[in-house]
Amino acid sequence: MTGTDDGTKAGTRGPARASGPRVPAPWVRTRLRAAPAAALALALLVALTAALAAAFPRAVDRYEDAGLRRTLDDASPRRTTVQFFAPRPDLELSLGEGENALREAALRKGYDAVLAAVDKPLVADRAQSSYGVRTSDPTDASESFLARPSGLPPRVALVAQNALGAHSRPASGRLPRATDPVTATTSEVEAAVTTETARTLHIKVGSVIHVPGLERAPLAVRITGIVAPREPDGAYWMSTPLIREPSLIQLPSDGGTYWIGALLLAPDAGPVLLGTPGKPERYWQVAPDTSGPTAHDVSGLASAVAALESGPGLARIRERVDPLTDATTDLDEVLSSFTELRSGIAPLVAVAAFGAGTVAAVVILMASGLAAERRRGELALVRARGGSLPGVLGRLLAETAVVAVPAGALGLGAALLAVPHARRSSAVAAALAVTVLACVALPVRAAFAHRAVRVHGGREDIASVRPSRRRTVAELTVLVLATAAVAALRRGGTDDAGSSGGSGDQLVALAPVLVGVIAALVLVRLYPFPLRRLAGPAGRLRGVVAPLSLARAGRTSASTALPLLALLTALTTAAFGGSVLAGVHTARDHAALLATGADGRIEATHALPTALPGRIRDTRGVREAVPVSVAYRAQARRGSGTAGETAALVGVEPGPYGQLSRELDLGGFPARTLRATGPGGSGSGSGSGSGKAVVPAIASPSLAARFGTAPFSVQLEDDSKVTVRIAAVRDVTPAVTDLDFLVVDREALTRRAARPTALLLTGGHLDGAALRRAAGGGVDVRLRAEVRTAYVHSPLQSGAERIYTAAVAAGAGYAVLALLLALVRAAPERSALLARLRTMGLTRAQGRRLLVLESLPQALLAAVGGALTGWAAIRLLAPGLDLTAIAVAGRPAPGGTARLRTDALSLLVPSLAVLVVATGVALAQAWWTGRRGSVRELRAGDGR
């Protein structure tokens, strides 16, 4: 045997290779090392998409939670507090037992029982909740020092509420005490009043107020202190506002006014109320904790409130406290208003979310398709050498998952950090969906491409490939879904969608996306026909660029459905979303215009000072100030014996007021419509007020329908009369809103009635502070911009608008990415083509034109198709979309329902952007190819 002792063969270097099977290189590691840039690009795409997908539901949760808190905070504690009350103890009880039932210990026991009946997610705010005993029927107080605005004695309620010292601080004197056990026969008790009550009713420390007794002498209530509430707007004081400040009561038929106030007794002085005729009652007030509930808890909150009002919770309270205990609250109505607003906004946000999500999904599929196309030869070779389809797909899934799963987790973590304090379940589900799609897209695409073992396949030119039956069936299925969604939205609208829930609502939200999908499929079907028709004539054209570019466009790969789908979906969503946002802004601006009648409005209940119009015109930003006189309670009637119709009679100067109406498009009219004789129109008010002369008037439709064109009489609030004849009918007029109106020339009115009570201001940048200084006190100054801002009150509105804008922007970004992916996919073939054509004499300028003209047909198809699809989607879906909820948030707003209208900028700008990007990328590719040279692209055996 020849060799060495260490087992090496003679003449060799190093040890001999070990015998046995060879260990193959790990597939995943090898592939990642072979294409690190592609792996990094996929990781970035998955991380970004997962972050956006996870952030969306959390952002929605955050603005909905903020909207719920704003709704609860805006509602007064009197509405949100759940109040339980029970009458005086059973008359069958002894006097001592009845007195014990009104002492603080017994009330505290009932309070604990009430709190125990509160079910989650409703949580009581113990710091602001209260209990006690009070007289439900205030009694007269005859002391002469008390305030009597019209000579009537004030009335006082006796209230013994817990924790008075913890919720107030003495402004003077001390808190009331109950040193000895108080009974129904106690002759004198101590009490405190709030600073507001003391100031209004003229009460001082040491004052004694006598309250009538029930079968006993009057009860003397000595004021020992005046207290200032620590949290005057808290539920402790505002659940029953009377204990904080008195209320002025107006008797009917001008019977006078009187005050009602509250005297705050010591918490353990409740038994004394049994000796008064004030009908004492026990009460327990549960203030909800408004900081804890989320929008996700609204249905549970409503159920908990219903249980306390008339359900199992109230039954438990009656069992443990008193069988006659009853409950009342408006918290259910507050929650219902929030739910209604959210239901009106959520479907609109869902439309944007589905649009952006669809485009993002298409981009991920395109990225996977690009990877599959890049590795077509490799995978075909593996299959030809015996690789099984499941084995190949499993390895593709593994190498994709190694990149996508960490990237998805990174995107989820970024979303959780960027949008804190919201539910995680929806975010995790969204990020998981993105990750799964990224993992399976490449294997599924490879499975369809390599079902059969083949090395070379035929060309799939868009102008020659015929759609398969499966594709036809799939397209017809999508067409049916889109038709159903559009029909459902037109029939039921987003209001029904937001309130019913379920898969039908998701189908409605998908309607714009499905319209874009159908348009993409139709355009892909139609696109080859003009290319086939133009192929012959193009060959007879002079020059090489035009026929070659058309031939290249016709030989584009048939797999253009995904890029076109992404572009059309993004363009449709952008046009639809832009029109929604433009419609919201237009609706707010129009509602604010109707509410003010101009850019600004200065109005008083009395005649304005004579010098005020001049001062206002001199204020910075004011272009014109049009004076008008408005009598809101004028009575229009035909004949003296007929019932009057209340209407607002507006006296105007026909010239300036008519011009203002025309400029604002609020029922414009020529000045001659209101002039009975000649131009005139000084507005001095030279009418006699007798109503003999007939003057022309502009009327609202309802008045015109009732009175026609015959003259009729109008009586003003100062008893003067004017006889008018309706000369024109207008739906709106700047001076009044949501009222029947008659507009006449001020010259026909008496001097008193013609004095202006309002000024309608125009100007681009009105200064509210300067106008208020110039107007002085006693007048109301309203600006159109301020009213418009007030319509954006709920975080539901502002949050939904931000989310909608972000979704549209994300969809546009993904559309650009889809366009770039489509161009990148064709980049190697285009580079090789340019290199070969340059060897044949093609100039650089011709190369640039060739690439631009080659990419222009598809870009032009997407741009024109996107604009038309967006327009069609808006026209189809507008009847079912109500923008009122997101525009004015349920606030009283004139102008009726806000409907979706086409916005030209939203249609044209995205489409033009597609053309610009496509042209720019083609020019950049031509420039870069020219810099690199042609040697690398002219390799022998290249199959491109």
Task: Give short role names for the model-derived ranges.
Residues 1-360, 424, 494-509, 522, ...:
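Membrane transport/envelope proteins' first extracytoplasmic loop
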Residues 1-30, 319-323, 640, 679-690, ...:
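Actinobacteria-biased recognition of intrinsically disordered, low-complexity terminal regions
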Residues 9-11, 37-41, 49-55, 274-279, ...:
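Alpha-helical transmembrane segments, especially those used as permease/efflux helices
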Residues 31, 362-401, 818-860, 939:
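Interfacial "coupling" helices/loops that link adjacent transmembrane helices in transporter permeases
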Residues 138-201, 624, 628-711:
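Short beta-strand boundary microenvironments
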Residues 350-370, 803-825, 857, 861, ...:
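Selective detector of the "anchor" transmembrane alpha-helix that sits immediately C-terminal
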Residues 355, 398-423, 726, 810, ...:
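Hydrophobic alpha-helical transmembrane segments that constitute the membrane-spanning cores
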Residues 492-678, 691, 696:
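Juxtamembrane segments of multi-pass membrane proteins
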